[in-house]
UniProtKB/Swiss-Prot annotation:
This is Ribosomal protein uS12 methylthiotransferase RimO. It is an enzyme of class 2 (transferase). It is found in: Cytoplasm. Keywords: 4Fe-4S, Cytoplasm, Iron, Iron-sulfur, Metal-binding, S-adenosyl-L-methionine, Transferase. Belongs to the methylthiotransferase family. RimO subfamily.
Amino acid sequence: MTVETFNPKQTTTLETPAKTLEAASADLANAESATGNRIGFVSLGCPKNLVDSERILTQLRIDGYEVTNSYDNADLVIVNTCGFIDAAVEESLDAVREALEENGKVIVTGCLGAKENQIREVHPDVLEITGPHSYEAVLKHVHKYVPKPEHNPFTSLIPQTGVKLTPKHYAYLKISEGCDNRCTFCIIPALRGDLDSRPAGSVLDEAKRLVESGVQEILVVSQDTSAYGKDKGGRTDFWNGMPVKQDITSLARQLGKMGAWVRLHYIYPYPWVDDLIPLMAEGLILPYLDIPMQHASPRILKMMKRPGRVDRQLEAIQRWREICPDLVIRSTFIVGFPGETEEDFEMLLDFLREARLDRVGCFKYSEVEGAVANTIAELISEDVKEDRYHRFMEVQAEISAERLARFVGRTMDILIDDVDEEGAIGRSFADAPEIDGMVFINGETELEPGMLVRAVITHSDEHDLWAELVDADAEDDIEA
């Protein structure tokens, strides 16, 4: 099975359609199995989709199937698709085509699966199609075409955390499905439905299992993380015999007590986001906010059906930084939205210059089938979108370099992700995996992934940091 890896430097958001590590898990590929009932798996899209893939893979292993990273050895291939933007749809259809050509027996699931007719039109030979988070339906179809093998569950035990496609030291924790917002450029509610929050006790149980298994960083994800619990109507859940309010602040507070890094993604700018900042200042959760703002022109924001008071957003950013000076803010924006004028775009650049955001990603508007935005105003030409994209990134590169430079000379905790012949590569609290920068510790080849080390930052650019390990005894002397 050929696995293409999306370059995180090219796109800087977790929503990026990308083939993930379906073949990178050696534990799966090399899992002992005498059944011969082998399932191939291709996972595309964002971390929310990755979590869905992990759940399906876990159930496959529980049922006794072997998961293989080879088309040739697979009795059937599952493709978990993304359908967020047209580029993702194209990539998903290409992945289905490849699976059909290389294997012939394919089940399609995921976001694009909600558009069965579109898939059937291109690939009529697909065996079955299900929509997103249709775990039981996927397993039912697998059982139909590849009978559930007889196996002894005690000889192939599954970890309590289930199958994970991420490195062992970090994991994504999905706390809800769906979204109640109706942004005109987005079709997620049509694909995944309205907000459906997991019970707080279930979320915390999973988080506890992850930490007990050695996970050192929990990345909290959903379509609308800050809306967690809104659909519960204020009802309280229970965990470890104690009541837990079902809202994002209460959940984050409990997660922060587990001893792992807790990083929040996809924070919609609701007023109660203010309540999260003190938790960051206290060190309970990482001082990191992934808060997609999308634009800064009130007119464009209104057309997007997004919060339109940019002055309030700037005031909030200033307020948050006063409470938590270490706060790192990541955001994403869209340029070339239908009807965007040069004046609208200049407002966006002015906002960047004033807000001084740490990490920023930019998308050129892409038509999404079924999105309201496609027809609300005149579409912007590709040449104009390309020009605005480069001007946007040029402005932000200078700001990002300035924000990263403040870490030079500072001693920080670095979580090691990889080690090669040149040294160790890790991340600080300011860096989410795959989408942000890295911390390079040259020459330290004896470190191992998952280690948390102390290092002093020696150099920075607009993306990354360089550091040297700190001698523990020397640091103790300084602190004394």
